[in-house]
Every structure is written in structure tokens, then in C-alpha cells.
């Protein structure tokens, strides 16, 4: 695979494209794209740009350099702090994680993690989560929230950071990333869309021990139609910062890759914010001309950048643009003047004397609970196992039913997530083999930088016992044994297991023998066995899901602080299940083909240059399963509830602008509207996620292009409406270097999942 060399530095060159299949001996390459496009201050950015331009014009060269790099400080524990310019009232920026709340501090909330949000398929809840989480970051003096996560998208099912993102699907990811960004920035903090781009595994994500970081070799069509798709939505939503990724893309490090930063992000997408690197990912000062605006931490960056400008290697205009983009983001979200707390004001060392800063607000509590409820997915429910109806006796089994033994000052909230003691000493990004179950206690998020410490953990057993006290239910439990005794009087046996994932290492598999054995052992003794899995990604269930005594299965994902309480509401029918899978669950690992394992997992000792060819193109997850006619165990978009729904009255309106070719308008123009009616034809309240899939010529059989979640009482109907843009119908033309609508027939499918299609029609273009 190779990006051919450009004939000039123009951003619109036809030469800047990849050939999908070439001789294996050839190396993928990224062409240089220069100069770095300066900020234009267009549209909604105009006022912020004008203010930033005025402020930066008063800065010296040293002051501009100072705000482009991170400094160590004892004043706070922010992940990064930029330099300040006190004489001009520039206070600097505090940059900090995490994906489910402010980490390394106290008096904050632990929101549901990204994957849990993806399973909710709920746009409004995603926005509300983003808003209230953003307010907590602001209260702590965090200027830049290092999220949300649009990459890893999830190409490799065992990848360690898939849980930080929302879903494997680029359309769903784009919508939820955009909702999060709008919420964060309306709260007054700068959102960061990350990691740009191709950061699809943890193994060899950075250079270690003389081995280069893995190179994600991706063709131009796949970049646009799959991996860059959610970043397009993020930029359109106004993301004020972006983070480049650790690994190489087409054999150039992403944070030095001018094709990615200058050509795609700042050029094609017209990104107006600033680009920062992932921590310690800088390689040389040439990154500045490649489009990088901020370095964390600084190291020798400031000295080298100043020297490069003085000797003409880097232009002063590039430095001015770097500083302007950073300051403009500050103005853009309203952090100037007295509108924002002192940077890092609530980010103190927890072991040192400090004045507590309360970040939580009462208005967020129902949002956190609703979010926890909404991301649970019911996959099996037979023999009327659920909802529970005042059982006389419940038996609870499994290590995941209770809290970890410690919650103290752990800044990464590892707790039970360290499935092996050795994990604490292992080098991130290296090949390791850890237990796939975190047996130290229930998991409410994945591990490391994407996780924060919760104010409390509502664990399943405690929540069940609280309900049992009201119902006079007798509760048995055994949380340690792999083959526990079962009281024959149990109305139901609940088995709690988990599947952990964490930044730094990819998973060793998609199931573990101990947990599977526990389920089978309980099911052999209990006729009503209900399995609940807290999972940080895909978890195989074929080992036991067809056992006649396994009556119900819940994918509980990563619900945050209200985990147990939310689950009990669902188990007892106080709330209804409405989540849908944001990924496919296969029968076996082999169903994935070559993308099951991380690239270079079998690297030879003398191979210092690991390569990862994305030869599958856009065919991942359900797109791939559909194309190869592989039947999954549970398909993308699947989820049961306590009622059923009927779909009817499909109709399609098309605009005169829906024509073949490049088109005269924007790719964001609405060119079609699809209507349908959803009716609750069951006997209980519920919510259905109506999903729209397009069959685009010369593409995967179905691609998600719309979804609407509608709550209905029994017997009630409601219309759903899907507005489709020109981009939704387009493919990326690698010759024209434009989004193009092809001539042909486009199938339109509306249904309850990617395989449960209820209504279909065609659009001819």
C-alpha cells in the first residue's frame, strides 16, 4: 500500500491517494503536505479569531512558544499545563482526562463510559452527559477536556481502548461524538476529538526497546469512509482541539504526518482549532510545520522551536498560527476574563492538604442514572425470567457482584481493573498476557486514562439486597467459588462476570474459562440462571448461552457510579431495557478473520518495523459479516425489551439535489427524508431504536445512516423521520478527491437491528 508522492504542495492534489493493494514488499508512504493551512476565523469562529489575533499580536516570540508546550508544576495534577503570559492576562490552560469524568481528583461524578453511551443509542442523553460532565471539568479549573474519543473506532475487537469510544460504526460514532462536543463546549470547556487517526490497537502503539510503533497502513477511500468519518462530525460540531495519535500512519508518525494534519484535518476538513499530540508523542520540531500546534509535555520543544524559527527552519507565521489557534479556542468557549476559574484550581494532590472543590450539581444525578439504565442491553429473556416479581429467594454468584476492596487515592482508578498484579509494572503498549476478567470486583469503566474515581459504587449485590429488604426476599451469595452450591429453593440465580479492557494493552481474548465455567456450573444446578456481564468490549457467549437453564442474558457494559441501582431497576421492571448493541457479537473468534488479533502480535524478534495493512478496507464488524454472509450470535443494533414493536408506513422524499456526481451544494445538505411509523404492540412500556440502513452501490450491503429512539406506551404509535445528507449517499472518489454520489439503485432499510429489517424500498439516482 502506498501514498504516491505529490507533484506539488497543493492540498487538492489528485496524487494524494492510496492504492489499496500492491506488492507486499512495497511500503505505505505518506506524502508531505505543506504549508500548514492558517486559521481563517470563518463562520462561528470569527469573533474568537479576531480576539485571539489581537492578543497574540502583542506576544513576543518567547511568549508564543511558551503557550505551545506543557510544563510540569506542583500547583496541580492536571495532565498538562501550558505556559502563561501574565502581562497580557493569559492564564494558560489545564488539560486533563477522562472519558467518564474528571480523573485524579475527588468530589466529581463517574459517568457511564463511552461504550455504555453507545449502547444507549440516545442522542439527548449523550448531549446531557457531555454538558454536565463539562461543567464538572470547568468547576475543577480544567480548560481542555481530553475527549471524546472517535478513535479507536474498533477495527480490532481485542483492542484495549475500544470501550472509550462509542461504537464500531462511524455514523453512530460521529453523531454521539458531535453531541458530546456540543455539550462539553456549551459547559465552557474545550473538547478534544481524538485520536487522529488509525489508533486501532494498543500493541506497539509507541516505539519501545528499539522497535518502531506499528504503522497503520490505510488506503485513501477507507480513511475517508470509515476512520475519518466521525472526525468530520466532530469538526462540524465545533471541536476546538484535536489530538493526533501515537502510532504511525503509512509509515510516518501521526503527530509528524503533514498529510493527516495539514492535508486532511486543517485542509480538507477546515479544522479551526488546535492540534495537540498525545503525551510524549513528539519526535522532532518538524512536527510544527506538519501541523502540530501544542506539545505535551514540553521537554526540549521550546528551545528547539525557538531555534528553528530563528534559523528559518520553521516560519514565524507558523508559530503565530499555532498560538492564535490555541488562544482562539480559549475565546471560542468563553474562558476569557472572569468567566472561568483559575486553571487547575480543583486539581490538587489528594495526599496533600487541600481545600476541597465540589464539582457535582444535583441536576446531573438523574442524567447519570438515566444514562446508566439506558446502556444495558437485554440479549436473551426466556421463560418469563425477567422482570423479577418479588422473588422469595435469590442466589447471587460471581466476582463482579461486589465492590473492589480499595477506593482511595488511585488517580487512574485501577482498583479491580488490574486483573493481574503484574499489570502495575508492565510497560504500556508492549505485548502482555493478562486475565480477561477483573476478579477484584465489579467494573464500572475500563482502565487507565479513560477512567476516573467514582464518588461511590452502587454494586449489584448491595442494590439487590436493598431491594430484598423491601420485598422480604432471602438472598444467598458466593462471590469466590467457581463451582458454588445452589439452594434448590432459588427462584433465580444471578451470575455476575466481566470482561475488562484498559489503555496500554490489548485484550488476550474475548472470553475467559473461569467465568464461562462459573456460568455453566451454576446453570447445571439452577433452572433459572440469569447472566449479567459488565463488559468493556465484545464478549463471546457461545460457551453457554444456549444452555436451557440460562434464561436471560444482559450486557451491562460500563454504567458508572450508579451501576447496581440502575441494573436492579431494570431487573425488576421499574425501568425497561432499551439499549442496543453498538457492535456485533460473533459465535467465535474465527468469525472476524484476520482482524481478530492486533497486528504484529506474532512479531519476529528481529522485526523492528511492525506493519499493519488495513486490507479489509471499510469491511469491519457488521459490514464485513454481511458481505461474507457470516451469521453472528447477536447482530449490530440488536436488543430486546419488555414489549414488542411494529414498523409500518415507509415513505421516502428526495430532493432535486440528490443527483449523481459531485453535486453543486455541500455534502451536509439534506437530500432525502425517510418516514416510518413505530407502534408499541405489546403490553408494557418501552422504547425502540428505529435504525435506517442504506445499501450503496459498490459498498457494504448495509451501512447505518440514521437512527431515532422513541418511547411508547402500549398501543401507541409515533412517526419517525430520518434526514439524509448528500454525504450519507456518497463514496470517496480517490481520483477526483471528492465525495461523489454514484448512479444506480440505493436500497433503504428500516428496522430494529442491522439484520431485523422491517421495511425496505429503493431510491434510483
Curated annotation (Swiss-Prot):
Glycosylation sites: 66, 124, 250, 304, 311, 349, 549, 588, 657, 681
Temperature-dependent activity: Optimum temperature is 40-60 degrees Celsius.
Reaction catalysed by this enzyme: Hydrolysis of terminal, non-reducing beta-D-glucosyl residues with release of beta-D-glucose
EC number: 3.2.1.21
Record flagged with keyword Secreted: yes
Signal peptide: 1-24
Key words, A-Z: Carbohydrate metabolism, Cellulose degradation, Glycoprotein, Glycosidase, Hydrolase, Polysaccharide degradation, Secreted, Signal
Chief place of localization: secreted
Gene Ontology MF terms: beta-glucosidase activity
GO cellular component: extracellular region
Family: Belongs to the glycosyl hydrolase 3 family.
Additional remark text: The biological conversion of cellulose to glucose generally requires three types of hydrolytic enzymes: (1) Endoglucanases which cut internal beta-1,4-glucosidic bonds; (2) Exocellobiohydrolases that cut the disaccharide cellobiose from the non-reducing end of the cellulose polymer chain; (3) Beta-1,4-glucosidases which hydrolyze the cellobiose and other short cello-oligosaccharides to glucose.
General function of this protein: Beta-glucosidases are one of a number of cellulolytic enzymes involved in the degradation of cellulosic biomass. Catalyzes the last step releasing glucose from the inhibitory cellobiose. Shows higher activities on cellobiose and cellotriose but lower activities on laminarioligosaccharides and polymers.
Name of protein: Beta-glucosidase cel3A
Organism field: Pyricularia oryzae (strain 70-15 / ATCC MYA-4617 / FGSC 8958)
Amino acid at each position: 500500500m502506498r501514498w504516491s508522492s505529490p507533484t506539488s504542495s497543493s492540498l487538492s492534489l489528485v496524487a494524494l491517494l492510496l492504492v489499496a493493494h500492491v506488492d507486499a514488499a512495497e511500503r505505505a508512504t505518506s506524502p508531505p503536505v505543506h504549508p500548514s493551512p492558517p486559521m481563517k476565523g470563518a463562520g462561528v469562529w470569527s469573533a474568537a479569531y479576531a480576539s485571539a489575533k489581537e492578543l497574540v499580536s502583542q506576544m513576543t516570540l518567547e511568549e508564543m512558544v511558551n503557550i505551545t508546550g506543557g510544563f510540569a508544576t506542583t500547583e496541580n495534577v492536571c495532565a498538562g499545563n501550558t505556559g502563561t503570559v501574565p502581562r497580557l492576562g493569559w492564564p494558560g490552560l489545564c488539560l486533563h482526562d477522562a472519558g467518564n469524568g474528571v480523573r485524579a481528583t475527588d468530589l466529581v461524578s463517574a459517568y457511564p463510559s463511552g461504550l455504555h453511551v453507545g449502547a444507549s443509542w440516545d442522542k439527548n442523553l449523550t448531549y446531557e452527559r457531555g454538558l454536565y460532565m463539562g461543567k464538572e471539568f470547568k468547576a475543577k479549573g480544567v480548560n481542555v477536556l481530553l475527549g471524546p474519543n472517535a478513535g479507536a473506532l474498533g477495527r480490532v475487537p481485542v483492542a484495549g481502548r475500544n470501550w472509550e469510544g462509542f461504537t464500531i460504526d462511524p455514523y453512530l460514532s460521529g453523531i454521539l461524538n458531535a453531541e458530546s462536543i456540543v455539550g462539553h463546549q456549551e459547559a465552557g470547556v474545550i473538547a478534544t476529538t481524538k485520536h487522529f487517526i488509525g489508533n486501532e490497537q494498543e500493541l506497539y502503539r509507541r516505539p519501545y526497546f528499539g522497535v518502531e510503533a506499528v504503522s497503520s497502513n490505510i488506503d485513501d477511500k477507507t480513511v475517508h469512509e470509515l476512520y475519518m468519518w466521525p472526525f468530520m462530525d466532530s469538526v462540524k460540531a465545533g471541536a476546538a482541539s484535536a489530538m493526533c495519535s501515537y502510532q504511525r500512519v503509512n509509515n510516518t508518525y501521526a503527530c509528524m504526518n503533514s498529510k493527516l494534519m495539514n492535508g486532511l484535518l486543517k485542509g480538507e476538513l477546515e479544522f479551526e482549532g488546535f492540534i495537540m499530540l498525545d503525551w510524549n508523542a513528539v519526535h522532532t520540531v518538524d512536527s510544527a510545520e506538519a501541523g502540530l500546534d501544542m506539545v505535551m509535555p514540553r521537554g526540549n520543544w521550546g528551545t528547539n522551536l525557538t531555534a528553528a524559527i530563528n534559523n528559518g527552519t520553521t516560519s514565524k507565521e507558523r508559530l503565530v498560527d499555532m498560538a492564535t489557534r490555541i488562544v482562539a479556542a480559549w475565546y471560542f468557549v468563553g474562558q476569557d476574563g472572569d468567566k472561568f476559574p483559575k486553571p487547575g484550581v480543583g486539581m490538587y494532590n489528594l495526599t496533600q492538604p487541600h481545600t476541597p472543590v465540589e464539582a457535582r450539581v444535583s441536576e446531573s444525578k438523574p442524567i447519570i442514572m438515566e444514562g446508566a439504565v439506558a446502556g444495558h442491553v437485554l440479549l436473551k429473556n426466556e421463560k418469563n425470567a425477567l422482570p423479577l416479581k418479588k422473588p422469595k429467594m435469590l442466589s447471587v454468584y460471581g466476582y463482579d457482584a461486589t465492590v473492589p476492596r480499595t477506593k482511595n487515592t488511585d488517580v487512574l482508578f485501577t482498583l479491580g481493573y488490574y486483573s493481574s498484579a503484574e499489570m502495575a509494572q508492565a510497560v504500556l503498549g508492549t505485548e502482555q498476557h493478562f486475565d480477561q476478567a477483573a476478579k477484584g470486583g465489579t467494573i464500572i469503566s475500563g482502565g487507565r486514562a479513560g477512567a476516573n474515581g467514582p464518588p461511590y459504587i452502587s454494586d449489584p449485590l448491595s442494590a439487590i439486597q436493598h431491594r430484598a429488604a423491601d420485598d422480604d426476599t432471602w438472598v444467598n451469595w458466593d462471590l469466590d467459588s467457581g463451582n458454588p452450591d445452589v439452594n434448590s429453593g432459588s427462584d433465580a440465580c444471578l451470575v455476575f462476570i466481566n470482561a475488562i479492557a484498559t489503555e496500554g494493552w490489548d485484550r488476550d481474548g474475548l472470553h475467559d474459562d473461569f467465568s464461562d465455567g462459573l456460568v455453566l456450573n451454576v446453570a447445571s444446578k439452577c433452572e433459572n440462571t440469569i447472566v449479567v456481564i459488565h463488559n468493556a468490549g465484545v464478549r463471546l457467549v457461545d460457551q453457554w448461552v444456549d444452555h436451557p437453564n440460562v434464561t436471560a442474558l444482559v450486557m451491562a457494559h460500563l454504567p458508572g457510579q450508579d451501576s447496581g441501582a440502575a441494573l436492579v431497576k431494570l431487573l425488576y421492571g421499574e425501568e425497561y431495557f432499551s439499549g442496543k448493541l453498538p457492535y456485533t457479537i460473533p459465535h467465535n473468534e474465527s468469525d472476524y478473520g484476520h482482524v481478530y488479533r492486533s497486528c504484529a502480535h506474532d512479531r519476529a524478534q528481529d522485526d523492528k518495523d511492525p506493519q499493519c495493512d488495513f486490507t479489509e478496507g471499510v469491511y469491519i464488524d457488521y459490514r464485513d459479516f454481511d458481505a461474507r454472509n457470516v451469521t453472528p450470535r447477536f447482530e449490530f443494533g440488536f436488543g430486546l425489551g419488555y414489549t414488542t414493536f411494529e414498523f409500518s408506513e415507509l415513505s421516502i422524499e428526495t430532493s432535486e439535489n440528490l443527483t449523481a456526481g459531485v453535486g453543486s451544494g455541500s455534502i451536509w445538505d439534506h437530500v432525502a427524508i425517510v418516514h416510518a411509523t413505530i407502534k408499541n404492540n405489546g403490553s408494557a412500556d418501552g422504547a425502540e431504536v428505529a435504525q435506517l440502513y442504506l445499501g450503496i452501490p459498490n459498498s457494504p450491503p448495509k451501512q447505518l445512516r440514521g437512527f431515532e429512539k422513541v418511547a411508547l406506551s402500549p398501543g401507541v404509535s409515533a412517526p419517525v423521520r430520518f434526514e439524509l445528507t448528500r454525504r450519507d449517499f456518497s463514496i470517496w472518489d480517490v481520483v477526483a478527491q471528492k465525495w461523489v454520489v454514484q448512479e444506480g439503485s440505493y436500497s433503504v432499510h428500516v428496522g430494529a437491528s442491522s439484520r431485523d429489517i422491517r421495511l425496505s424500498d429503493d431510491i434510483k439516482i
